[in-house]
């Protein structure tokens, strides 16, 4: 990503996966274990419609469980896994065992130094600095 974090404009045809108030696992070693999504960046929907995010989207999370220095704080994060099946352009359907995010800094780099578990290819393509820490890209 360039200096400023960018979000996609069109969301047509995407499967609503994680939305506001969804509890997600934090898959890096930043100290957070579990977080709640509180907003989705770049979402332009109808009035009173709950915003949703997909793999690779930038969200704001509130850390609920983890180390005392990160609990009760808000961070930007990238969705790297979702349980809801989604379709890739080649026609394959993919889903993961959990909903997971990686906490990122304002410049788009991950706050932690390692990512546990697989990372979706869609997230790795949009966030190359996050992909460099991934052990497995699916």
Swiss-Prot record:
Name the protein family: Belongs to the universal ribosomal protein uL14 family.
Q: Give the matching NCBIfam families.
A: PRK08571.1, uL14_arch
The keyword rRNA-binding is assigned to this record: yes
Q: Name one Pfam family in it.
A: Ribosomal_L14
- UniProt GO cellular component terms: cytosolic large ribosomal subunit
Q: Name one GO biological process term.
A: translation
Q: Which Gene3D superfamilies match?
A: Ribosomal protein L14 (2.40.150.20)
Q: Which CDD domains does the UniProt record give?
A: Ribosomal_uL14 (cd00337)
Domain of life where this protein originates: Archaea
Q: What is this protein called?
A: Large ribosomal subunit protein uL14
State a single Gene Ontology molecular function.
structural constituent of ribosome
Q: What InterPro entries would the database entry show?
A: Ribosomal_uL14 (IPR000218), Ribosomal_uL14_arc (IPR019971), Ribosomal_uL14_CS (IPR019972), Ribosomal_uL14_sf (IPR036853)
Q: Which gene encodes it?
A: rpl14
Disulfide links within the chain: none
Q: Which UniProt keywords apply?
A: Ribonucleoprotein, Ribosomal protein, RNA-binding, rRNA-binding
**PROSITE patterns of this UniProt entry?**
RIBOSOMAL_L14 (PS00049)
* Secreted among keywords: no
Record's function text: Binds to 23S rRNA. Forms part of two intersubunit bridges in the 70S ribosome.
SUBUNIT field: Part of the 50S ribosomal subunit. Forms a cluster with proteins L3 and L24e, part of which may contact the 16S rRNA in 2 intersubunit bridges.
């Amino acid at each position: 990503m360039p200096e400023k974090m960018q979000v996609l404009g069109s969301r047509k045809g995407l499967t609503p996966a994680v939305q506001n108030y969804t509890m997600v696992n934090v898959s890096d070693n930043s100290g957070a274990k579990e977080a709640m999504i509180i907003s989705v960046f770049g979402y332009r929907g109808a009035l009173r419609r709950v915003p949703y995010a997909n793999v690779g989207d930038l969200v704001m999370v509130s850390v609920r469980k983890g180390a005392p220095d990160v609990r009760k704080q808000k961070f930007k994060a990238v969705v790297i896994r979702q349980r809801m099946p989604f379709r890739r352009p080649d026609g394959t359907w993919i889903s993961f065992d959990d909903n997971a995010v990686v906490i990122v800094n304002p410049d788009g780099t991950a706050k932690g130094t390692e990512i546990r578990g697989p990372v979706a290819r869609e997230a790795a393509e949009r966030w190359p600095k996050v992909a460099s820490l991934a052990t497995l890209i699916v």
